[in-house]
Amino acid sequence: MASSTCLIHSSSFGVGGKKVKMNTMIRSKLFSIRSALDTKVSDMSVNAPKGLFPPEPEHYRGPKLKVAIIGAGLAGMSTAVELLDQGHEVDIYESRQFIGGKVGSFVDKRGNHIEMGLHVFFGCYNNLFRLMKKVGADENLLVKDHTHTFVNRGGEIGELDFRLPMGAPLHGIRAFLTTNQLKPYDKARNAVALALSPVVRALIDPNGAMQDIRNLDNISFSDWFLSKGGTRMSIQRMWDPVAYALGFIDCDNISARCMLTIFSLFATKTEASLLRMLKGSPDVYLSGPIRKYITDKGGRFHLRWGCREILYDELSNGDTYITGIAMSKATNKKLVKADVYVAACDVPGIKRLIPSEWREWDLFDNIYKLVGVPVVTVQLRYNGWVTEMQDLEKSRQLRAAVGLDNLLYTPDADFSCFSDLALSSPEDYYIEGQGSLIQAVLTPGDPYMPLPNDAIIERVRKQVLDLFPSSQGLEVLWSSVVKIGQSLYREGPGKDPFRPDQKTPVKNFFLAGSYTKQDYIDSMEGATLSGRQAAAYICSAGEDLAALRKKIAADHPEQLINKDSNVSDELSLV
């Protein structure tokens, strides 16, 4: 069995309780899946929290600015797209040799696509869908059946089935009342807890409900849920897998704000709970179209250029501003100058970047109260179809892909969510003559970080077999392990106040990243929203930033951006 590894210490995202077997599931038809975003999408702008779904920006009429963005993840690229649309000049610097950050992927020496994690697109990802439509990537999404599937030990399947023509909130009520993942008593107590939540207010007053949800940041979801009559069994069998999938931590450790933010959208928007996945790898089908849009608009990517130091000074009035950023690529070193600097990093990345003196400002110091969660992503390629449990003969043939085509949750393994990418993202992951490609996310990843690849792969292989006993006898042909030391920030109780605004006390320095202040959780959607917010701050400060450029010219002419030493001349284009 071949295997590969990638270690990344920080990245620059029935009734009556009786379970049923797979005969309740609809098998996938590999090439007949809806993909357009023009269908099966709720209008998120109607009766929705404005913080989550901001209106389109007004046309910018201020001075053109030269912007340097550190980080080519979703947050950085979202910022770049918004600024380029408003006529600014943008350069993006990325220390890796590929873009995408936590949603990045690359091809190894054997031609396998390696991802940083399992990427699922909830129907409430309005800002990300907006970006994808803008860059022409909307047709790259495959719509899955509108059901959330739980795979329990022994191959028992539980569901939250949202397939009801009446829509929200009735489809959600039906899903929770008829789920076979919980026993009747737990379902009843679950219904009581949700009925006593801000989710109900969201039906008539979404902004008020959003404020109520923010106010619950200082309590864990478990404490909130149990206080409202929910049961520990509901947490263990349903909500923990969901919490792990969303934030990589369990309900005892995740803020009630995070879970209830999602619940409020599921309750009010029919398609918010509808899942999509990319038709293939993120680098090809997500980052690729965004990169093309940026370069077509005149933006520039500079890969393998890392920021070593932020250089700054003070004006006569005491205002701090950046004079340049010291960049390096292998043994090459350059000084990059711009009108505006955006740090689109993750939590460990921004901690390394901020000058220690800036911690005198609470906005920067508070970042050090945030920590990332370790996560391990494992890929296992089989010589048959792991999730096909009804027909043993079909699971052994390699002429056509069969099995469960969706995101899958489980409460009975160290990986909370997983998918067979050969089914769910077939363009790059279905290989003729081979079988399932199980991609599983180990959360929390702490116990796995020090383990060697072979030990991790063997543990995951055994747990997959526990979930799918019918896969006994299938062999693992190939595997990969990706370790990320700090991924999403740990969204524990009381951490939301420490998330920084995109606008900082440093006049020409802005932040982007899913950890920054925005009403969604740390996620692809959160990263995209943070980029929109950062760009909005920059455009609203356009006149002031142009005035700062003039003042620097008057007070420190040696710090000017001159045509002979501009960024595009200093760095090779990619």
UniProtKB/Swiss-Prot annotation:
Pathway: Carotenoid biosynthesis; lycopene biosynthesis. Its cofactor is NAD(+); NADP(+); FAD. It catalyses: 9,9'-di-cis-zeta-carotene + 2 a quinone = 7,7',9,9'-tetra-cis-lycopene + 2 a quinol. It is an enzyme of class 1 (oxidoreductase). Disulfide bonds: none annotated. It comes from the Eukaryota. One of its GO terms (biological process) is carotenoid biosynthetic process. Keywords: Carotenoid biosynthesis, Chloroplast, Chromoplast, FAD, Flavoprotein, NAD, Oxidoreductase, Plastid, Transit peptide. InterPro entries: Amino_oxidase (IPR002937), FAD/NAD-bd_sf (IPR036188), Zeta_caro_desat (IPR014103), Zeta_carotene_desat/Oxidored (IPR050464). One of its GO terms (cellular component) is chromoplast. It is found in: Plastid, Chloroplast; Plastid, Chromoplast. Its EC number is 1.3.5.6. SUPFAM superfamilies: FAD/NAD(P)-binding domain. GO terms for molecular function: 9,9'-di-cis-zeta-carotene desaturase activity. Belongs to the zeta carotene desaturase family. Catalyzes the conversion of zeta-carotene to lycopene via the intermediary of neurosporene. PANTHER family: PROTOPORPHYRINOGEN OXIDASE (PTHR42923), ZETA-CAROTENE DESATURASE, CHLOROPLASTIC_CHROMOPLASTIC (PTHR42923:SF41). This is Zeta-carotene desaturase, chloroplastic/chromoplastic. The lineage of its organism: Eukaryota, Viridiplantae, Streptophyta, Embryophyta, Tracheophyta.
